[in-house]
């Protein structure tokens, strides 16, 4: 496969994620809530958000970095539009990645939580995911 074909595949996946998210955003608005990306946009300086791991399917969290009043921050917002924002292994992996980057750089983290809890279908792995996230958060406190 060529680089151009690979790029096309990535862009198609990104578009599919945004379209899936749009349906969930409408449901959020009906509930009187803002979507994850909207909450991040309201917090950060305009145009400063750099999303990380966007193509992680069904993670249920939007994560990245940006600035608040010109100061760098890492941020993550659970996305209730994806599996009610429930925490599982994929979501924890994205969050832990952000927390580790913040620890290495001494940069603050803003967490926007909107979740129904753990992904019970993942069983003990979901609880382990929570434990991993909370352990990393405790190290940053």
Predicted regions and their residues:
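Terminal-region recognition feature
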Residues: 1-141
